[in-house]
Amino acid sequence: MANMKAARDARSAAVVINAGSRRGAAHELAVDAMRKAGVPISSVHPVHSGADLAGTLDRVLADGHDLVVVGGGDGTVSYAAGRVAGTNTVLGVLPLGTANDFARTLEIPGNLSQACAALADGKVVDVDLGRANGEPFLNVASVGLSVAVTEALSPRLKRYIGPLAYSIATLSAYARHKSFRARLEFPEGDHEPMELEDLLQVAVGNGRHYGGGNTVSPTAGIDDHTLDIYAIVAGPLREHVSIARLLKDGSFIKHDRVHHVTSRAVRLVTDPALPVNLDGEIAAVTPTDFTIQRNAVHVVVPQGSTSALFDGPGAENWPPL
């Protein structure tokens, strides 16, 4: 990666595509577009399952490609980021999913041909990676309502109606939500423990966007080396509607029913124990230790992107010493 300033500077690039993602069928057009733009693609790997994705990523990394372009939704890209974290391999992103929030954070165009052009001519930056009991996430980890939303989001619903699927799934999940209690502990001592009751949701953000374009907080960033933690207290429907109206710009964190803090590490304990949603995938359970791996992933972004900087040739080791 030493001299890679753009994707076309790579010695060898592998493309890994989640064929089941919402726009996965368009991957051949994307590969052709990247090749014409000068990306030195030497292998293309459509995958059809999580196990297939894991094995394919292991193989392409072992083959020594210095650029791995991953096409899929946020769950696919987040998993791939966990595999390349702490290495000198550069990650390229093709937004082929429904929400594509990581791409939105990095200012990667949603239009596929524009995304291919931006990737070929893009610059390399470093971004942070969140960890939940060691499992990676790029955007947001959460418990509560968001898990029920994920469970209500069928692949068919996402494929046929796109981002609108999140609104439909949210209404369905809200109708059957049960509140819970949580304790937030801060191992670095930057906050006193927080005991919270009657909660709708707790979320821990590493990136800036989630849920199809919502904003974690007005100041959240993918390279600020900080986690944004918020908890929403259950209440009347009208209160939740007022919060929902503030999600797009992140100003909801100032609402009376929202608790918000920032930290580099937090432990979440809930009663009852709850599953944890990591970038759209249920991949952990409480109690959960959330940490941040600074500058963990080298990734290609458009030349005009201001989302992150390149801080150095190496990422922070994982696990931290």
Indicate where each model-derived feature is located.
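ATP/NTP phosphate-donor binding region
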Residues: 1-68, 78, 306-321
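ATP/nucleoside-binding phosphotransfer catalytic cores, i.e., glycine-rich phosphate-binding loops
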Residues: 2-5, 188, 221, 231-321
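Catalytic core of DAGKc-family lipid kinases
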Residues: 14, 25-28, 36-37, 47, ...
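Glycine-rich beta-strand-to-loop/alpha-helix junction loops that act as flexible
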Residues: 19, 71-73, 94-96, 206
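Short Gly/Thr/Asp-enriched flexible loops that form oxyanion-binding sites at enzyme active sites
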Residues: 76-89
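Glycine-rich phosphate/pyrophosphate-binding beta-alpha loops
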Residues: 142, 146, 203-218, 282
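Gly/Ser/Thr-rich active-site loops/lids in small-molecule metabolic enzymes
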Residues: 155-165, 218-239
